[in-house]
Amino acid sequence: MHPEICKIGPFTVYSYGLMLVLAFVVSSFLAARQARKENINPEIIFNLLFFVFICGIIGARIFYVIQNLKDYLKDPKEIIMLQHGGLAWFGGLFAGVIASVIYLKIKKLHILKIIDLVIPFLALAQSIGRIGCLLNGCCFGKPSPEHGIYFAVHDAVLIPTQMYSSLLLLVIFIILRLLQDKPHKEGQIFFVYLLLYAPKRFFIESLRADNPIVFSGFTLFQILSVAIFFVSLAGLIYLARKKK
């Protein structure tokens, strides 16, 4: 664990923030390159991703703060301390989708086509971001002396759920890229992403120790994952039956 990478004068470079920036840079570069291949202005893609990145972080933070409101009411200034971690993917997804629709509507572009273009690279960005979680020590797993690693901030040997999540997201990225290079209907890549992400998150949640049980032995994110799985499955079935 390395929550702090280094200090430059009075400024501290935090691993979590650094990984978020790296995730944005790498995903934007690769998405822009893919846009050129599809004869789409890469500047539009970069601007879209920047807008989605900012809105996604805000949405993810708001969702996380609401989920842990009692803790943040005790120390409100922690709400803006992103260097300590604390982003909820589901809030980021909701905000990111809304931001994408608004931006693409303004630009009068095909919404599903562009989302299909960028979504594999957002999965890659998530994979990189989870490395930041590992270095920061957030999103941690349950105690496991046999299969865990030592987290100094928790003074315990825990399951490295961040690492598992990062690797699974990398696999999702590879699958989506393979599908992207084959003929597909608009929206299909996006729904496949959700279909793959949902069981991934459900599994990881079963190993995590930082999210409370809310209903019948399941965490809130497991319940949301089940809902997203069936919504994405319905979306894929609809696209399969839809005439070109």
Task: Give the predicted meaning of each segment.
Residues 1-244:
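A feature for loop-to-transmembrane-helix boundaries and adjacent hydrophobic helices
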